[in-house]
Amino acid sequence: MSDLKRIVIDDTEVEVDGAMTLIQACEEAGVEIPRFCYHERLSIAGNCRMCLVEVVGGPPKPAASCAMQVRDLRPGPEGQAPVVKTNSPMVKKAREGVMEFMLINHPLDCPICDQGGECDLQDQAMAYGLSGTRFSEAKRAVDDINLGPLVSTQMTRCISCTRCVRFTSEVAGITQMGQTGRGEDAEITSYLNQTLDSNLQGNIIDLCPVGALTSKPYAFTARPWELTKTETIDVMDALGSNIRVDTKGREVKRILPRNHDGVNEEWISDKTRFVWDGLRRQRLDTPFVRVDGKLRPATWGEALGAVATAMKGKKVAGLVGDLVSTEAAYALKQLIEGQGGSVECRTDGAKLPGANRAGYLGTATIEDIDNAQMIQLIGTNPREEAPVLNARIRKAWINGATIGLVGEPADLTYDYVHVGNDRAALVEIAAKDIGPAKDMNTVVIIGMGALTEADGAAVLSQAMKLAENTKSKFMVLHTAAARVGAMDAGCVTEGGLAGAIDGAEVVYNLGADEVEIADGPFVVYQGSHGDRGAHRADVILPGAAYTEEQGLFVNTEGRPQLALRAAFPPGEAKENWAILRALSAELGATQPWDTQAGLRRALVEDVPHLGDIDQVAENTWKREPLKKPAKASLRYAVNDFYLTNPIARASEVMAELSALAKARKDAPMAAE
């Protein structure tokens, strides 16, 4: 039965869900209500009082619109719809009073505050406040707290909205922040002066409506109006979080989240947010050719000529790295297969079936987790592999979902049923008749750590059997942003990585820095950073990073998304697709496209669903043939969240965070 209620907001009658709060109803009616503490993804605190409205026929004082539901309003004496006024003299006076209280102890140091220009307090003081103040006493001051290397604190600016406290406890799942004291003595602090132990902590910077919490790495580097803003996609994990990259000149200055309810909501991980300093360190900005055992700078003509000479008439293998766009992977496939070679993207050894999209991707969407009543994790630690997805699993747990884990025990920020450590536990539950689960919304999530061992195909088959027996949605949680798109483009070889490089005389390494290539083959490395792959190379071709070229990326649920260029590659580095196009001409096998748009058209002709941007194609369920796995314990794919790719390894901030995380594990706080 519908619970729709009629309500009049500023002379406009609307029909809304009775469970809505007044502030949500006003938004439905197109009326903007100022707020500081209210946030639609956090619990309601009702402590800033900026959202006051007048309820006609209700209490004689203004009501907090964030805390009152539409169903609580009384109709008129003859059954008329309740009336709410958001701009009456009573409301204006109330807002002026609240704003005056807000500014009593605020230092008003906007010229030196990093929040200046994008500050809610500035905007609302201008729109709803008075031009002066009656307060003449001394302002209070509060000691700053040390939250770690990411979040800078100026707690005298704090207005006690408690958004940061609610985010850390409700979304991030840590209890290190809280509010102490009352009235003028109230302050936000951390438990025993601990630094924050969460890989989502940077989101409190966005949530803070004032300049109390700001970014330490970004401090005093730019003003918002000086920055060029580009909407693009993150590649630090396979979730495909929507981000905004802000640049000044040729440099990336900061990375912020964009809202996408189906992917990352409005959160991003700390690696996504703070990895930008790695974009300008250890960069490859000129081609290199190895001469007499040493890498020497070369021109593009010399480097491409050396590669073409090495490849002609030889057995060539191509490797697709974790941060490569789908167009670049497809271009490499066309180039290498045109020379009679093979291409492989499963560089971690994952036993994913190239011909079965339901097997290497699954059938679940990220949003399916929201409504799940039971979630079974197999060989995955989502807190390390996809922190934003883990926050969504935590939200499902808060809403009553039961979580199960097959794998080593880990702190996932929520309670779970530990089914077992090893493959035998998976085989056991896959063979059971779990009757009640068939009538529930259930999701089975398997991680890359479970699929990279020799029996990965058998583990996958058991997980798919479990999903089939329980009528669950199935999700393969990838860790590489490029993996799904490359598999869609057909960058797979029979026998996987070993089959691709077996007997290869030339290995063309497109950004695969996690692979150890044995001595013997001639190695060409095309990538953005001087990392492991470049050290082994005989020729280095400097390419663009993910912020420096357009490209398609397909996330772990199969959603194609378009990344846009926010900056330009340094020095003589080129876009990856352009390098491969130039090399094809050098080989005398010129590809039939000479622009990225032409390349993308060819890709979409071969793989039509990649043209449906931001749409998740439905996969036909096809269970892999059942096999018996070994008996060893399942391992996790990510050992160090902060150092999983060459950009992160080049980042000073990520190195510091990695060291802090290791120190915490080595010396946990004693219980007292």
Labelled PLM ranges:
Residues S2-E27, R35, H39, V55-G58, ...:
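N-terminal export/assembly segments and adjacent metallocofactor-ligating motifs
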Residues Y38-N47, Q69, R182:
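Short, glycine-/polar-rich solvent-exposed loops and beta-turns at beta-strand/coil boundaries
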Residues C51, C66:
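Acidic, glycine-enriched active-site microenvironments
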Residues T347-I613, K665-E672:
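Non-catalytic alpha/beta scaffold blocks inside enzyme catalytic domains
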Residues G598-E672:
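Long, low-complexity segments enriched in small/aliphatic residues
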